[in-house]
Amino acid sequence: YDAQGETFCALDHAALIWEQGHSIAIMGESGSGKSTLARLMIGLERPSEGRILINGVDTTKWSLREWRKYRGKIQAVFQDAGGTLNPAWSTSKNVEEALVNLTDLSPSQRKNRIAELMEQTGLSKNLLDTPVRRLSGGEQRRLALLRSLSISPEFLILDEVTAGLDLISTEAVLQLLEKYEQEHDCAYLVITHDLQIASRLCEVIYEIEHGKITKKAVR
């Protein structure tokens, strides 16, 4: 993209392997290209040049219908979770909207699914009817995680998902992610500055610098 009249390459031949059931982490300094890579993978941004290959398919040529089918399998939780939620809707409606669009669950099944995940993410059931704009930043991030997990994705991008959470909330989120991965064979792409979190959740850790993958470590 262009910055102050100069062309800046956010990513340059950043290739990595991410397979179902195998979680990976991306670590690097701010501005290294971590979040840009995640947003490109889920179609929230388009590359100015080059291609994005997922299972050998160039997603830059996908139609809106193809992206919708893909998003039933992959979800993302970004650090600014509030930007992906409707602030005027209640917590339950934000989650139920995803369940209506991307699952075949009945109304009663949707209600039970939301209640179950509210408990697992440490969100009080008293917040079910609370507008999202009245939630704290940490509560919004846990709600975004809850919504993503509710549709049982095969792949989940986690962009600094525990940043700013207290120790108790962080541990609750990590335990939930570990349990979900084991039960559903889900693969995470974890973007974090915390090596302990990366090592706990992931088998492979990539380091990115100036838009390029520079290191790879296998746990």
PLM feature segments, named:
Residues M27-E29:
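The feature captures the beta-strand-to-loop junction immediately N-terminal to the Walker
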Residues T59-Q75, K93, N101:
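ABC ATPase NBD coupling module
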Residues D80, A88-N101:
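Q-loop/switch helix immediately C-terminal to the Walker
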Residues I42:
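Helix-to-loop junction immediately C-terminal to a conserved catalytic motif
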Residues P131-L135, E139:
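Conserved ABC ATPase signature
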Residues G50-D58:
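Conserved ABC transporter NBD signature motif
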Residues Q109-N126:
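Conserved ABC ATPase "signature" region
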